[in-house]
Amino acid sequence: GGPSQKQKQHKVNLVNIKVYI
């Protein structure tokens, strides 16, 4: 995906890690 806001990037990071594993 593409984090538009930096604040949302934090939430996307957690989800990305889960999908990455």
From Swiss-Prot:
Tissue and organ expression note: Hemolymph.
Classification lineage: Eukaryota, Metazoa, Ecdysozoa, Arthropoda, Crustacea
Highest taxon of source: Eukaryota
Protein known as: Hemocyanin subunit 6
Function summary: Hemocyanins are copper-containing oxygen carriers occurring freely dissolved in the hemolymph of many mollusks and arthropods.
Keywords for this protein: Copper, Oxygen transport, Secreted, Transport
A GO CC annotation given for this chain: extracellular region
Gene source species: Maja squinado
GO molecular function terms noted in the UniProt entry: oxygen carrier activity
Localization annotation: Secreted, Extracellular space
